[in-house]
């Protein structure tokens, strides 16, 4: 998967979850009487900046690390941040942050990382996904030289790539247009609201 699919589809999924959670029938039912002490929970307010960060984080770190900084050692764009170990650490850190500070930003990052793994089908690459159980990451020598050409070719020839990219683009276009029309770009930048 490329940038648009990771960003757009993850953003759309998080938005759908937020709207579903905030549209519970429980919130719309009147109290049964004075003895009914049900209190509607506070609405979920997602900070989409952290969702986007989590969705892009594995590629933001692993691609430069494997192709630019350490191409002779790693020669792979899916390394440390594409492993189950990283996902587990991210989720545990999110839970600790939430428990200690009642802050949701770690959960949002973990959600973004999880969706990144799902879209990359990481379980299909057990050497990377289960690292370090199977030893070192597989090397793809020479890939850095033709990576841009290969990405462009794959983008236009593989439906499993260009369809999610197109969907991600449309979702990002929808949210960007909406933010501009409603003049909420600043609110998104400062508070992560859509």
Model region roles, listed by residue range:
Residues 1-194:
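N-terminal membrane-targeting hydrophobic helices
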């Amino acid at each position: 998967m490329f940038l648009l699919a990771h960003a757009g589809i993850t953003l759309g999924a998080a938005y759908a979850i937020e709207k579903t959670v905030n549209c519970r029938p429980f919130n719309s039912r009147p109290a049964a009487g004075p003895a009914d002490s049900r209190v509607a929970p506070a609405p979920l307010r997602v900070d989409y900046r952290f969702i986007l960060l989590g969705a892009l984080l594995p590629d933001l770190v692993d691609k430069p690390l494997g192709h630019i900084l350490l191409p002779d050692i790693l020669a792979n764009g899916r390394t440390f941040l594409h492993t189950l170990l990283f996902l587990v650490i991210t989720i545990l850190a999110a839970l600790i942050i939430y428990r200690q500070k009642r802050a949701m930003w770690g959960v949002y990052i973990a959600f973004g990382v999880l969706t990144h793994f799902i879209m990359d089908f990481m379980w299909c690459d057990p050497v990377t996904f289960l690292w370090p159980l199977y030893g070192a990451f597989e090397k793809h020598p020479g890939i850095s030289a033709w990576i841009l050409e290969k990405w462009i070719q794959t983008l236009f020839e593989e439906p499993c790539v260009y369809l999610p990219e197109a969907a991600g683009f449309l979702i990002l276009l929808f949210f960007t247009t909406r933010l501009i029309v409603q003049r909420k770009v600043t609110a998104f930048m400062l508070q992560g609201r859509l």
